[in-house]
Amino acid sequence: MAKGTRGKPSVIRPSYDDDSGSDGELANVLQARDEPSDGDDDDMDSISFGALNAAQRKLDQKASKKKGGKAQRRRSDGDRDNSDDSDGDSDGSEEEGDFFETSDDNDQGYNKGKSSGRNPRKQVQKKKSKHAPSESSSKRPVSKVRDIGGLESKSMYRDIRFDPAYGKANLDEVRKNYSFLDDYRQQEVQEMEQVLKKDRNLSHFNKQKLEFKVQSLKSRLDTLNNRDLENKILSEHKKEQLAKFKSGSQANPYFLKKSDKRKLIQKAKFDNMKTSQREKVMERKRKRRLGKEFKELEFNRH
């Protein structure tokens, strides 16, 4: 040192070394804090953020021992972030932001965690009331296959004889194989009609229920019989046309149109009806015809 020069404390240059290499700087900083001098402001400007951060961590550790470890839990999360920012690879701006971070935010976060008693992320939200709808996270995707409320559940058992996956069912063959069920249906209708006649102690509700079942079974039997009659008429016509074609009396077989099929079926049904049924059908047709005529008259007046 030259003569006449004033003695100055050693200047600490800014550096971004690891915490292990900043022990000497830490000792100088602590010593400089206790010994005031004229160049304190200049020295503080030249101290690295890593050294200041390490010094702050040392002071916090000492304070936590006196307060029973409460301050250590409060600043544990902030210390982890600050230790990462003090590495040599981190930027100076990031270190400065972490260093000047206020302790109010940490205190608020600590109070929130202390009041809840557990991690708020893991805490399950409770329903406001038992009648409130259940809540689910919107971040979890909804499954593609799910049950819809109000619809009937799928049957657990399936009859492969009527399963469309095994091909289209032959209704004529099914009707032929299960035609014996008509006898059971007819017998059931007769038994329910006898109950309605003999049992007079039936309630109004049970009586209406039995009448509805009788009417439903009768209409089902009529539908099956009409379908059998239609199939029978069409098959007989087809056989007749093929016989004429084979005998040579007809050049080509004649295939009926839908309108011709409808007329042929109606004629066959009318022939097989009883007298009372025919009268009802004729009366229904007459009323329908009169209604059409009245509508035409009203339209012509306007």
Curated annotation (Swiss-Prot):
Coiled-coil segments on the chain, per record: 206-228, 277-298
Subcellular location: Nucleus, Nucleolus
Biased composition (Basic and acidic residues): 74-83, 144-154
Ranges of Basic residues composition bias in the record: 64-73, 119-131
Family membership noted in the UniProt record: Belongs to the RRP36 family.
Keywords: Coiled coil, Nucleus, Ribonucleoprotein, Ribosome biogenesis, rRNA processing
Listed Acidic residues bias regions: 84-107
Protein name according to UniProt: rRNA biogenesis protein RRP36
Species, as recorded: Debaryomyces hansenii (strain ATCC 36239 / CBS 767 / BCRC 21394 / JCM 1990 / NBRC 0083 / IGC 2968)
Region described as Disordered: spans on this chain: 1-154
Quaternary assembly: Associates with 90S and pre-40S pre-ribosomal particles.
Gene: RRP36
Cellular component terms (Gene Ontology): 90S preribosome; nucleolus; small-subunit processome
GO biological process, one term: maturation of SSU-rRNA from tricistronic rRNA transcript (SSU-rRNA, 5.8S rRNA, LSU-rRNA)
InterPro entries tied to this protein: RRP36
